[in-house]
């Protein structure tokens, strides 16, 4: 809606779409590089801190709001995100089976996993250029270091290369423990990691 500068914020029109019960916690707003979109991480319900964190997209020219990531196309929370330089997709981190992976989602809502299923947690996500990302990564075996992720056309096939090895001199003196997945059956018959 248009802003009427002669009225206070309380008396402005509200952009409220049919069925939009946007009352939950919103955070991390970002404009797309081309300035056409505003995105933010959004929870649906007020006062429910375990609510799913979705990625909301607002098209500035039309006032249309949609969710490029929600439970329909990614069954986990959006942690952090950054826009691709061409404004056609968004890179994000999300936790799946106790590891934080990097994903890419287009404006068409198609989600592609960028990194593989290894036991690592990625964070501090940033775009370096059209083909590379910069991120921190740690695991149960290694402390945080910085990595360059070179994108690939195939899902889960990005090349991941360490550019720091801050604690390598310490880890080289230690025996490497073994880390294993352990799934247990829950009381309702499901599997839990």
Where are the language model's segments positioned?
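Residue-level detector of Asp-centered blade-edge/turn motifs that repeat once per structural unit
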Residues: 33-34, 85-86, 128-130
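Conserved beta-strand positions in repeat-built beta-propeller and related beta-rich domains
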Residues: 93-95, 137
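Terminal RNA-binding accessory module
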Residues: 102, 193
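Structured, non-catalytic alpha/beta "coupling" segments that mediate domain-domain communication
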Residues: 126-152, 157
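A structural signal for beta-strand boundary/capping segments at domain termini and interdomain linkers
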Residues: 189-191
């Amino acid at each position: 809606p248009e802003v009427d500068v002669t009225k206070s914020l309380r008396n402005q029109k509200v952009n409220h779409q049919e069925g939009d019960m946007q009352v939950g916690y919103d955070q991390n707003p970002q404009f797309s590089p081309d300035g056409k979109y505003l995105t933010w991480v959004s929870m649906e319900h007020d006062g429910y801190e375990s609510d799913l964190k979705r990625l909301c997209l607002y098209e500035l020219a039309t006032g249309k709001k949609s969710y490029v990531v929600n439970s329909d196309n990614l069954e986990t929370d959006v942690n952090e995100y950054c826009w691709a330089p061409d404004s056609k997709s968004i890179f994000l981190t999300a936790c799946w089976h106790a590891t934080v992976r990097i994903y890419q989602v287009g404006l068409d809502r198609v989600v592609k996993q960028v990194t593989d299923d290894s036991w690592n947690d990625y964070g501090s996500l940033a775009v370096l250029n059209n083909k590379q990302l910069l991120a921190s990564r740690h695991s149960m075996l290694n402390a945080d270091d910085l990595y360059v992720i070179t994108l690939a056309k195939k899902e889960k096939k990005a090349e991941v290369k360490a550019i720091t090895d801050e604690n390598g001199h310490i880890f080289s003196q230690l025996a490497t423990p073994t880390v294993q997945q352990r799934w247990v059956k829950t009381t309702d018959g499901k599997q839990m990691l």
